[in-house]
């Protein structure tokens, strides 16, 4: 009989999706954004102030898929890794809320729309 122990995982790793959650990747806040609103133009997110190169908005279904709630985002200031096809990773903080019903991560891009980004990415909560 073998006495080899079976490795165990901490509970926080068991409650997160392995490899990330596939989400629609969109952009907002860029010059000429047809869906822009006055709060975004002022740099105000639903949870925290918006910062170029750092802020993202997530839909409620995206938050749920990552095991988060709106109140957790307000109190914890969570960051996510956005894994792009081809190997790139964007590190962003959840500062805003996107209104759509689908799983979506919306990059705050006040410097302009980036046409090089794909339409989908895998999103994981940073430890």
Which residue stretches match the model-derived regions?
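Secreted/periplasmic proteins
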Residues: 2-127
């Amino acid at each position: 009989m073998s006495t080899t122990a079976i490795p165990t995982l901490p509970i926080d790793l068991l409650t997160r999706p392995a490899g990330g959650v596939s989400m629609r990747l969109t952009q907002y806040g860029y010059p000429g954004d047809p869906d822009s609103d006055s709060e975004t133009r002022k740099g105000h997110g639903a949870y925290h102030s918006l910062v170029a190169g750092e802020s993202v908005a997530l839909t409620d279904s995206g938050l749920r898929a990552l095991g988060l709630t709106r109140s957790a985002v307000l109190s914890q200031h969570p960051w996510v890794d956005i894994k792009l096809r081809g190997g790139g990773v964007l590190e962003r903080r959840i500062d805003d809320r996107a209104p759509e019903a689908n799983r979506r991560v919306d990059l705050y891009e006040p410097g302009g729309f980036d046409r090089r980004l794909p339409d989908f990415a895998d999103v994981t909560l940073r430890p």
